[in-house]
Every structure is written in structure tokens, then in C-alpha cells.
């Protein structure tokens, strides 16, 4: 991050008069991180610039608190990470925390910092930390959410429903399957994918309806090919990653949503619809994921998928809007006082 020399002290002026404060949004490019970062940014109602980051090896293999010479660890890619500095930064994930802190330092302490997820180091230097309940992080600057913040809103769902209006003609019920993949906690083998595909095929054969399925990058080419081979003959669609992304349209049209257990982000997005959410169990897990899944079951949001589809509802808690309003008020208050640190 050579564009952030340690001696740089340039900054943008506070937003004047009725001008909206401006933000930079930092994330590592992973879809879940990007969704959370953009969701919070959109919820503030402030203009922002998205700045995906690239973390170079060997730093990419280490937690940020162990990085030596961090100015060389990260690049903003095609986006400049130099002055003029924004009024505030939204950083998502630990890999974005280091550049966020360096921006604050380079701005002379004038740029306000909001961090999504526990940075696990130098927490007192962030003005706001938005952390999910299962992280068990508490403090005067911590805003606790039920799951992950996200981009799902009623307006976006309705707009995407209209944009992909041809999908509305599919036979009901429409079952949506959101398939993730292996991560540090879970394993998604081809055998387990075959079991999931067979369960979905059995459901559609017995009860009719349609399937809208989207794999993720972590599903892998072989996994996606398997799903297509076993489920491609049923009414519906399996997104191949090309063209416009129908993800939000799928959520809007769903009668029930099935999500693999590895993704807090996708489960949180599904839960923002108020529709039945089934979790497809995978091998593995850890204490943090178990806390999340237990919380979602206790709230009446999710149930394990056992081969049948039922109907239930639950109150939608819009933590993203709450976090966005909190951050916006914090930024405006800081600017209104003529200070940002």
C-alpha cells in the first residue's frame, strides 16, 4: 500500500453545509465480505466508493496482527488509496482492518472508522464495530447484530423480482437452494453434494414445483457440474455465473430457501425475507458456527432440512438498517462538531 506513506497528513475537508459525507468501502473481494460491506454502506444513505483490496502472500497466510511491513501487504488494485481522504471508512473483515487504520493515521485522525466483524486487534481505534452476536464481542463501540449485515431490502427484492419476471411463471412451490462450499470450519464433499441433489430431486418428484439454485465459487466446477447433471431436468434454473446475477430475484420468488451450513452471510440474507429457511448440514463446524445456528433455530428462523417443505414465518429484524442509521448519525455528529477524531 505504497500510496499511504507514514508521513502523509492530507485529508478532505469535513462535508460542508448540507453535503453528504463520503465513504470508502474496503473488503477483500470475497462475495460474503463484499455483500456485508456494501450492505452497511448502502444503509447509511451516503455516497461511497468501493475499493476492493488484494492481499499479497505471505501476508495473506497470516492474521493481520502478525503482519510485518504492512504497507507492502495490500494493494487497492485499480483504486487509489491516497488523498483526499474520505469522511469515513467501512472495512469488512480482518484483512481490511490494517489499511483502514493506516488511512485514519494518514488523514491525521480525521477519518472515522467502522469495522464489520471483530478485527481482533486494536479494537479501541475503531469508532464503530459491527459484529454478529455469535462473535460474543461487546463494548461501548460495538453494535451487535443477529447475523451478518447484508444488501437484502424489500425494495431490492421487488426490483429484482420485476427484472427477472420470467421466473415468476415457474410452477409453485419455488424452492431456492443456495450452495456454498468448504471453508475453515466445514467440508462439502462431492458425496455430500450428491446427497443434497438427491434430496432435492426427491422433493421435486414427490411434490412438484420448481428449483432455483445458485452455487458459489467455493462449490467448485466439479460440484456445480454434479448439481447440473442431477437437477438440470427439473423446472427452474441453475445459475452458471454468466450474465446478470439473479440471486436477489431467487430470494424474492422463493417459497422456501435451503442454504448450506457453511455460510452465515447467505443464511442471514435468506432470513431477511421472512420466508422458511432450511439449513443443509455439512461435516465439520466449530463453536462459533454452532452458536449462530442455535440462535437462528431458537429465533424460529431456521430448521434443519429433512426432505420436506413446511410453511412458517417469523419477525424480520433489520439489523443492517439499524447499523447504517447508527453509523450515519455518528458521522454526521462528528462532522457537525467540526471534528472527526
Predicted features, each with a name:
Residues 25-144, 150:
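Active-site and donor-binding regions of nucleotide-sugar-utilizing enzymes
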Residues 51-52, 130-131, 211-217, 281:
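Short internal beta-strands
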Residues 123-189, 305-313, 317, 321:
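A nucleotide-sugar donor-handling region in carbohydrate enzymes
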Residues 182-215:
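Conserved catalytic-core segment of nucleotide-activated headgroup transferases in glycan assembly
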Residues 217-231:
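Short, structured helix-loop element that forms part of the nucleotide-activated donor/catalytic region
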Residues 227-265:
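Donor nucleotide-activated moiety binding/catalytic core segment of transferases
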Residues 265-314:
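Catalytic binding pocket for nucleotide-activated donors in carbohydrate/polymer assembly enzymes
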Residues 294-341:
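Leloir-type glycosyltransferase catalytic cores
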Amino acid at each position: 500500500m505504497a500510496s499511504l506513506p507514514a508521513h502523509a497528513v492530507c485529508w478532505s475537508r469535513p462535508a460542508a453545509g448540507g453535503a453528504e459525507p463520503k465513504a470508502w468501502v474496503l473488503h477483500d473481494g470475497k462475495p460474503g465480505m463484499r455483500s456485508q460491506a456494501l450492505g452497511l454502506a448502502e444503509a447509511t444513505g451516503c455516497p461511497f466508493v468501493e475499493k476492493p483490496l488484494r492481499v499479497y502472500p505471505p501476508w495473506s497466510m497470516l492474521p493481520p496482527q502478525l503482519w510485518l511491513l504492512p504497507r507492502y501487504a495490500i494493494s487497492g488494485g485499480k483504486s487509489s488509496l491516497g488523498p483526499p481522504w474520505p469522511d469515513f471508512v467501512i472495512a469488512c473483515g480482518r484483512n481490511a482492518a490494517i489499511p483502514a487504520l493506516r488511512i485514519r493515521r494518514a488523514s491525521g485522525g480525521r477519518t472515522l472508522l467502522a469495522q464489520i466483524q471483530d478485527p481482533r486487534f486494536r479494537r479501541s481505534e475503531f469508532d464503530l464495530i459491527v459484529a454478529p452476536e455469535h462473535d460474543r464481542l461487546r463494548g461501548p463501540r460495538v453494535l451487535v447484530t443477529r447475523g451478518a449485515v447484508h444488501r437484502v431490502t424489500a425494495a431490492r427484492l421487488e426490483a429484482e423480482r420485476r427484472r427477472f419476471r420470467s421466473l415468476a411463471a415457474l410452477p409453485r412451490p419455488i424452492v431456492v437452494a443456495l450452495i456454498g462450499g468448504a471453508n475453515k470450519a466445514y467440508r462439502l464433499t462431492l458425496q455430500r453434494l450428491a446427497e443434497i441433489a438427491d434430496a432435492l430431486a426427491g422433493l421435486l418428484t414427490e411434490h412438484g414445483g420448481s428449483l432455483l439454485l445458485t452455487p458459489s465459487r467455493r462449490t467448485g466446477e466439479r460440484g456445480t457440474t454434479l448439481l447440473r447433471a442431477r437437477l438440470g431436468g427439473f423446472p427452474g434454473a441453475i445459475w452458471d455465473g454468466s450474465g446478470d446475477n439473479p440471486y436477489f430475484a431467487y430470494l424474492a420468488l422463493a417459497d422456501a430457501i435451503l442454504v448450506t451450513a457453511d455460510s452465515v452471510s447467505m443464511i442471514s440474507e435468506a432470513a431477511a425475507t421472512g420466508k422458511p429457511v432450511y439449513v443443509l448440514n455439512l461435516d465439520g463446524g466449530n463453536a462459533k458456527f454452532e452458536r449462530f445456528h442455535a440462535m437462528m433455530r431458537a429465533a424460529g428462523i431456521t430448521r434443519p432440512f429433512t426432505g420436506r417443505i413446511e410453511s412458517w414465518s417469523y419477525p424480520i429484524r433489520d439489523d443492517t438498517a439499524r447499523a447504517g442509521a447508527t453509523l450515519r448519525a455518528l458521522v454526521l455528529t462528528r462532522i457537525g462538531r467540526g471534528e472527526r477524531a
